[in-house]
Structure formats: C-alpha cells, structure tokens
Curated annotation (Swiss-Prot):
This is MAU2 chromatid cohesion factor homolog. InterPro entries: MAU2. The gene is ssl3. One of its GO terms (biological process) is chromatin looping. GO terms for cellular component: chromatin; cytosol; nucleus; Scc2-Scc4 cohesin loading complex; SMC loading complex. Keywords: Cell cycle, Cell division, Chromosome partition, Mitosis, Nucleus. Interacts with mis4 and rad21. It is found in: Nucleus. Its main location: nucleus. The keyword Methyltransferase does not apply. Involved in sister chromatid cohesion. Forms a complex with mis4, which is required for the association of the cohesin complex with chromosomes. The lineage of its organism: Eukaryota, Fungi, Dikarya, Ascomycota, Taphrinomycotina. GO terms for molecular function: cohesin loader activity; double-stranded DNA binding. Belongs to the SCC4/mau-2 family.
Amino acid sequence: MTGLNETDARILVTSRHLFLWPLAETYFKNAEKVLQDCGVCDSFGRLLSTGLQCLYSVLMDTKMEPRVELLTRKRICEVLLSHTVEYADVEAILNRALIIAEQHNLTEYKFSLQLLLSRVFCRTSPKAAKVLLTRCVREAEEYAKVAEIYHSNNQSNPHRWVYEFLLATLEFQNVSQVANSIHNYANHHKHQHLQLLAMILNQSLPMDEISTDSDQISILCLVTQIAQCLRKGEILLAREILPKIHSKLESETFVWPSSYIDFFIDDTSKISIKWMSINQLYLLIYLISGFCYISDSTSGRASRFLQEGLRITGDFKHQERCVLEYLESQKWINNITKDMKYYLIATYLSRSRLSKAERILQSTEDDQTGFLGILKGMYLQKRGDLKKAEVHYRETAKNFSFRTDTFIISTLNLINILEDSAAASRCLESIEPLCNKHEKKIFKLWLLVLKVIREGPQVHQSNVLPRVIQQSSEYANTQLQYISLTELSERFGKLEHAEKMAISALELAKKSKDELWCLISGRILEDFYRSVQKYDKMRQQALENSAYSKLIEDIYSFV
C-alpha cells in the first residue's frame, strides 16, 4: 500500500471541512425532521450534538484557511442560537470570527456575524444590542454608498444589510420608528417591496388592492388591511376584505412555501421576514373571520368560524425547524386557542346562549389580559346576578396593567348595571375623554347611549338615539341596536314610533334567535299595546312573551 506524501497529507488535512460540513448538515437536517415529527426529544438532541461535533472537529484543524474557520464558527453560532440559549458560548465563538473578518476585510461576512451577535445581546444586554445595531446601521449605509459608487460586484445587494440591521432593532425600538426608517431609506433608493414592508409594519396600507406576484405578500397585505379596519372598529369594511383572503386560500394555485416571506430589493437580493406557517395562517384567518362577525348576533358565522378554528387546533402540526421557533409556535398555538375560546364565549353571550358560554367558561384558564373577567361579568349580568357581575367589572377596571380597551369595556359594562346614579355619573365623566379620543368610534356610541339612559327620559334627548341606531347598524353592532331601539321605544310613550321601535327590536332579536331580547322587546311592545288599549294585539304579544319566558326560565334567574 502506497503511503501519502507530505503535500497530499497537507491537502487532506486542510480539506477536512469538505467532508465534515456536508456530514454536519445531514445530521442537522435529520434533527429538524425529528423535531417536526416528535418535538424536542432525546434523538433530536443526539443528532444535533453529533452535527455540532462535526463542526467543532473542523475547528481543530490547525491548517485550515481563515475563511473556512469563519464560516464554520458562523454555522455553529447559527445552530446554537436556533436550538439553545448558550449565549456565552455563542458570543465567544462569534468574537473570534469577527476578528478574522476584520483582519481579512470580509465586510459582508462581518455584517452577518454582527447580526448574529445582536441576537445574543438582545437576550443578554439590550443596551449593548442598541449600541451595536446603531453602529451597524451607520456602517452598512456607508458601505452601501461606497459599493454604489464603485459598482462593486457583490453577491448580494449592499443595501440589504441596512434593512437587516434596521429590522433587528425591532427588538428594542418602536415599530413605527423602525417602519419609518425603512420607508425613508427604501423610498430614497426606490426599493418598492421594502416600501411595502414598511407600510405593513406601520399598519398604514391603503385600502386599495395591492398588486403583487407573491401569494404570501398578498395575504399579508390583506390581513394587515383587516387589522387596520378592526383597530378603528370598521367592521363592515373588514368583512368586505375577508372573501378575498378565503378565495386565495382556496385557490388551486395558492403557494405558501415556508414561514418566511421574501421581500426583494432587486432581482437577486431579498430580505426574508419570519411570519407564520401555512397551518398557523389558517388558524389566524379563522380567528379574524370569527372576530369580524362577533358583534352581529343576527349571523351565526362568528361561532362557525371559531368552532372550526378550535377543531383544527387539535390537529395542528408544527413545521418549525429549530427548537426556539418550535417553542414560540407552541406558545402561539396556546394563545390563539385561548383567544378563540374567549371570542366564542363572547359570541354565545351576544346571542344569549348561556349554557354553551358556561361550558367553555368552566374549562378556560384565567389570563393576564382581563378579558376573561369581562366575560364572566357579562355572563353573570345575563343571568341577572348583577352584584357578582359588578365585582368582576370593578376588579377588571381597577387593574391598570390591562389595555385601554379592556378598561373602557369593563367600565361601560359597570355603568350599565350600577344602581347608584351618582357613582354611575362619576364613572361616565371619568371615561368620557378616553371614549371620545379612541380610534374605535363604537365606544363613543356606547357612552352616548349610557349617558342618555342615565340622564332620564326627557323627550328632547331622544334625538341622540336615532343617530346611534343608524351608526350601530353601520358598525354591525346588534347589542347596541337592541338597547337603542328599546330605550327609544320607551321614550316615545304612546306615540306610533314607540311601536315601530319595539317591533324593530323584536324582529332583530328573532333574526338572532335571542330569546332574552325577544322577551325584553316583546314586553315593551306588550306594555305599549296596553297603554294605547289595543287589547287584541296585547293578548297576542302576551302569549308570545309567555312562550319566550318558558324557554329561558331555567337560565335567567330574574324571569
């Protein structure tokens, strides 16, 4: 057997990475498959550890080229950051790689390493991350300017690093500030996809249809437009967009290759943004679709969308390829399942399906948002247990850690049931500024109705209620329509309009199949017929009311 000469031996040793790099990637690929199929388990850990050992073996080669060492260290750090929290090890490995990049003037490699280092600092030292990324943005901008002047033949567009670093600052900087920085830079350099990304981040998309060749970007734009509508309470406009999303999802040509969405700077360079997998997307669309119909109790769509969403959460399959993303995905699925349950409870309560709402309430764990406290209060209020409902509303309203929306809703509900008129008036005064300046105009309408109810049955105030009825219809809020119609009917007394308002409320309740509001509006109509001595209609309505009363006497304690 012929031995190797000195030159051959040197080539064999220094080429160690040519064998070990692909071998390591094979182990990593198999580890990812195990993660997707079985989650975090022993076999996953063994495969990951063996792959890392392959890369560490490359670093033991004393004669390897600097670029080989740099790339090996970079890959080790990518794997560690994806699957572990070994931040100290990653920082040490990266610092050595950065020295190599500086020594050999490998600027783009240096940028990629700094991006990884910023991820470490965001977890260990946010202040250091801010200092690092601020400097990196400035250096990347200077690098891009020089590259443009000298027409450098880079593999990637030099502007890419500016965007990468700006996006990394989202860890500690306001989204609006980052979006504005991206938009200004993209606008100056005419990067249309990145301008679009900035508008998505800032939730400032126009309501027109966005033309794009990417199914992923198209869906993301539609979801963002719906989010913009919901933020302002423009429910009907959000519903107009929903069919476009469902149509795209059902299309045979629909493509969703991964959790990452590509925004192109030019024909070859792109920024990949992590959003969600196709399985997560379907759940999100079911949640949004259900939410768009919650306020309209005349439609059963909200419960159908939310029930279907909850059904498929049981069959959810993770598609993440790293442990930290897998854990984030698990947290996400838990949160969206909880949100679906909450909104389904709200849907059942809006249609007076108390037994269904109660079953879900009993199986739902509390959270830190205060929403469950409001739902419990609403349930007790529907049951007629106003004292206990008041306790839930007060506890939720006085917790300053909750969102403004939560505070407003709990306070409005509290005002609605308070027996102490002076306390109710004080609550109205305190919450009025918040309702008036809030983006969701529906809060202002609720405030107006409660003020009118609390200020007494003067006829001259009734002109507020017709306006509320019209606007509540535009916002597709059935509960607000019920209250406004019945209150207005009682204010009209013996006038013909009183009958019309009560009949409208009753028809709305029948369409919603809401026995409680059928009974409430039916009793108002019965009292009206009695007051104007229409005894035949009164007796007919009394029989109908008796039937509704029997339907719900096991549920409502005050009937």
